[in-house]
Amino acid sequence: MKQFLNEQIEFYEVQKFKQKTLTVLVVVAAIFPLLFFIYGYYLQSVEHIPFGDKPLSNQGLLISIAISLIFAVGILVLFFSSKLETYITKSGIHVRLFPFMKFKTYSFDNIKRFNIREYSPILDYGGWGIRIGPAGRAFNVYGKVGIQLLFKDGARLLIGTQKPEDFYNALSKFCNQNEVHK
């Protein structure tokens, strides 16, 4: 367990990818190669029609099916187990996008100001996940509302949230109110 989990938690949120379009895209991209090789194996072994100009052997197609199956299962497990976790404790803001990154802690001392912000994941950051765009870095998996942090060094970080008011209020407990803007 992470050390900060022994502290009192002021805010906690878990978000998962919920966009239907993105889910369909990931599922299709993961399963298409598998279906492609299954179709090729069917053509070659059942219909006795060579699959392609330089066809693989049936054994080669079976190996391709096995590799495609492993790939599809891996991609789908990663996608459906992915989650953005955000904690606020007295030691800072703790964020991770599981299973792609460990918890990253942002100290309150380094935050110049913060605010609730609507954003476009695609236009502002090029999509969802761990992103870097013209507006800075972002951790987002769903929705279009987040907490925009401006650090004293000028860096920006947006953390997507479905609970912007709760996030903001928890953050307000630890940051200097004179430098914070809603």
Model-assigned labels for residue ranges:
Residues 5-7, 133-182:
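A membrane-cytosol interface segment of integral membrane proteins
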Residues 14-16, 95-158:
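Non-transmembrane, membrane-adjacent beta-strand/coil modules in membrane-associated proteins
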Residues 48, 74, 128-129, 160:
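Glycine-centered small-residue hotspots that permit tight backbone geometry or close packing
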Residues 62-63:
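Terminal domain-initiation and capping elements
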Residues 67-79, 129-130, 136-141:
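Short, solvent-exposed secondary-structure boundary motifs
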Residues 70-113:
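Conserved beta-hairpin
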